[in-house]
Amino acid sequence: MNQSLLTPFGTAIERVEAALTSLRQGQGVLVVDDEDRENEGDLIYSAQSLTNEQMALLIRECSGIVCLCLTDERIKQLDLPPMVEDNSSQYGTAFTVSIEAKVGVTTGVSAADRVTTIKAAIADNAVPEDLARPGHVYPLRAQSGGVFSRRGHTEGTIDLMLLAGLKPAGVLCEITNPDGTMARLPEIIQFGQQHNLPVLTIEDIVEYRKVTMEKAS
């Protein structure tokens, strides 16, 4: 990854701080993973403040596969089994069965319906019976150690929410180019500038967590 492209967004610590500010204000962030991994950028929002307009942007500008990142505790609370028993995906992305809210949706596929499903799944008193299976929202189970355990967008999302003091649940979707190909760093930065979204990397989150842990010790 050409880190020099990220220079306008500040240092790693400054990039994370900008992302946390954006999330606290109910806005989104763009997170890029390692070049030797997926080498993709995800548009990420806090699940608790997600709006219909933000969901529409995810559907319109991204891959359309909108995922809900949840902690292992929340996955257990909702009794969501893995999508498959033997996960053979290249990076072990922990998809569960897809979900739909049982109340307040029509076909489940519209932006408003997907937001309704997400709000139902993250409600404090949510129970398995609140959700139909399958559906049009794809939960992902984050590993408990965050980016220290797995350098994925799922864990990065949960880490960012916790660092921002928000409910540990986030929504993500991969950024794609208009021709359907996956966006790389130059296109992701351009997208961020177009939509006034901060850009950071998984490595930035790793570094930020290390620094904050050292300060706390």
Swiss-Prot record:
Domain of life per record: Bacteria
Q: Where is the signal peptide?
A: none
Instruction: Describe which pathway this protein belongs to, using the record's wording.
Output: Cofactor biosynthesis; riboflavin biosynthesis; 2-hydroxy-3-oxobutyl phosphate from D-ribulose 5-phosphate: step 1/1
Alphabetically list the UniProt keywords. Answer: Lyase, Magnesium, Manganese, Metal-binding, Riboflavin biosynthesis
EC number(s) per entry: 4.1.99.12
Catalytic activity entry:
D-ribulose 5-phosphate = (2S)-2-hydroxy-3-oxobutyl phosphate + formate + H(+)
**What are the site positions for Essential for catalytic activity?**
136, 174
- GO biological process terms held by the UniProt record: riboflavin biosynthetic process
Tell me the residue numbers annotated for binding Mg(2+) 2.
38, 153
Cofactor binding, per record: Binds 2 divalent metal cations per subunit. Magnesium or manganese.
GO annotations of cellular component type: cytosol
Enzyme kind, highest EC tier: lyase
Assembly and interaction partners: Homodimer.
Cite the NCBIfam families for this sequence: ribB
Its annotated function is as follows: Catalyzes the conversion of D-ribulose 5-phosphate to formate and 3,4-dihydroxy-2-butanone 4-phosphate.
What family does this chain come from, according to its entry?
A: Belongs to the DHBP synthase family.
Supply the name of the protein: 3,4-dihydroxy-2-butanone 4-phosphate synthase
Species annotation: Shewanella woodyi (strain ATCC 51908 / MS32)
Taxonomy of the source species: Bacteria, Pseudomonadati, Pseudomonadota, Gammaproteobacteria, Alteromonadales
Gene responsible for this protein: ribB
